[in-house]
A protein has these predicted regions:
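Solvent-exposed interaction surfaces and binding hotspots enriched for charged
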Residues: 2-104
Length: 104
């Protein structure tokens, strides 16, 4: 099944399922490792995979090099937007996950 043959709703569902599977795996890893290290590993894995994705869109090394700044700008903007949204979302449920209050 290609993404061209499925609806936007199906793509959204698959997207969310992939996200959940990455988070589930990260949570498993965080049981045995520091969450900070797991987060950094996820960032590195995402950057490595996205470098591969960018390379797949270029027909040759010259095209690849021409696309680098555009790709970097795109992924940085996407990450900033996603991080900002998730930080805001997490603020709403902070006390659910933290049973203590830090001194102000």
């Amino acid at each position: 099944m290609t993404q061209d043959s499925i609806s936007d709703d199906e793509i959204d569902t698959l997207y969310r399922e992939m996200i959940d599977s990455f988070i589930d795996r990260a949570n498993e890893l965080a049981d045995q490792n520091s969450p900070e290290n797991v987060g950094l590993a996820l960032l590195f894995a995402a950057s490595r995979f996205n470098a591969f994705v960018v390379s797949q869109h270029a027909e040759n090394i010259d095209d690849y090099e021409k696309d680098l700044v555009k790709a970097q700008d795109f992924f940085r903007a996407q990450y900033r937007e996603m991080l900002d949204q998730n930080l805001e979302d997490y603020k709403k449920v902070y006390t659910k996950y933290h049973k203590f209050t830090r001194p102000q």
